[in-house]
Amino acid sequence: MAAAAAADEAATRDVQRLLVQFQDEGGQLLGSPFDVPVDITPDKLQLVCNALLAQEDPLPLAFYVHDAEIVSSLGRTLESQAVETEKVLDIIYQPQAIFRVRAVTRCTSSLEGHSEAVISVAFSPTGKYLASGSGDTTVRFWDLSTETPHFTCQGHRHWVLSISWSPDGKKLASGCKNGQILLWDPSTGKQVGRALTGHSKWITALSWEPLHANPECRYVASSSKDGSVRVWDTTAGRCERTLTGHAQSVTCLRWGGDGLLYSASQDRTIKVWRAHDGVLCRTLQGHGHWVNTMALSTDYALRTGAFEPAEASVNAQDLRGSLQELKERALSRYNLVRGQGPERLVSGSDDFTLFLWSPAEDKKPLARMTGHQALINQVVFSPDSRVIASASFDKSIKLWDGRTGKYLASLRGHVAAVYQIAWSADSRLLVSGSSDSTLKVWDVKAQKLSTDLPGHADEVYAVDWSPDGQRVASGGKDKCLRIWRR
């Protein structure tokens, strides 16, 4: 009734009308076609759509026609897109994050302690802990309630190049320049188990088995400049299997949610492996130079596991519940972002291009994304998987449609290479760190700069946004770790 009433109320005015049909992102139709005035606003569409969905609590929704969001009215969007309106017009509806992350605006702590550059920073899955890896060979944990140093972890004998949290937040893996991997307990700062050795050159990336696949968080995969990928049993402290096939250094690695491992290399290829036995499924080819970076559409759900950012409290907690409960929560969060189709993968290269793939299904790319004028440093899917952001040496960040790879916008403001980017948990904001020594926070929907954050004395190598939305952490050449809040 409410749907009919909202449509009828608009019908009393003498306005051009259109026949429209709602459908979700997967193409599932909602209700039957109905006619609306051409000047209908998103608020009115929201009333009609929520009535058709029969939700107890109305959902915040966004509406799209041919990939363009309806911002002021349907008519305005149609004019800008020059859309044919003779037949039924499909309007795609998408639920939006119910919670909001506010932009960080100021540096609340400048934490000294590292004696060389900070190479990586990473918040734990709930945002309770912050870890950093440095050229001074140490890993450090920082106390976020007091924003002070907590533990200094010594054990590596060379630069710590890569760090990665287990999705239950109970272990941190770190990899260094001499090929060694160590595991740490964030609550004590002590090393867990023995060093994992076997790689002959430095560690380029670490990726844990997803929580919904194994709530014990027992297995971690590593990639190395030696061209191999290894899967480790962290409980037994041994290498479970070695995946070989790349002809050059493996630059990045992802452990996907559907039982696949993805590795990208300087040999210009991405290889897709079956995680449980190491069988090579397919090789993705297309890049004309080194593949530097890749991301999965499900990365954020995999990283945060059973943690739901919408339920975050002011003081981050550990995850509670039995292993089975955590596994089920992680699986439902993964399935929600994965949607109907398999997870998508985006890769970025020294050849200035990105490719979008559906690696579980096909070795042909879904899209080739061009526009950057220099090599691509990092690429990241938004937590809701709808937008891809890429950071480049051309000083820009570009936004792309997460389903089609279509170009959306360029974010300009940095005056030197953009090294790293991180999304807020609600997918509305993006923070970037640059060689120009600044961080910048961007409003993704408005496609403009929200806040400029100077403060570092030199290049910013690493940046992360806590999954609870409270803080941004950054580190770089000035050896200083900075925490930013709203």
Curated annotation (Swiss-Prot):
The modification Phosphoserine is found at residue 80. The keyword Metal-binding does not apply. Pfam families: NLE, WD40. GO terms for biological process: hematopoietic stem cell homeostasis; inner cell mass cell differentiation; kidney development; mitotic cell cycle; negative regulation of mitotic cell cycle; Notch signaling pathway; positive regulation of canonical Wnt signaling pathway; regulation of Notch signaling pathway. InterPro entries: G-protein_beta_WD-40_rep, Gprotein_B, NLE, WD40/YVTN_repeat-like_dom_sf, WD40_repeat_CS, WD40_repeat_dom_sf, WD40_rpt. It is found in: Nucleus, Nucleolus. Belongs to the NLE1/RSA4 family. Associates with the pre-60S ribosomal particle. Interacts (via WD repeats) with uL18. Interacts (via UBL domain) with MDN1 (via VWFA/MIDAS domain). Plays a role in regulating Notch activity. Plays a role in regulating the expression of CDKN1A and several members of the Wnt pathway, probably via its effects on Notch activity. Required during embryogenesis for inner mass cell survival. This is Notchless protein homolog 1. It comes from Bos taurus.
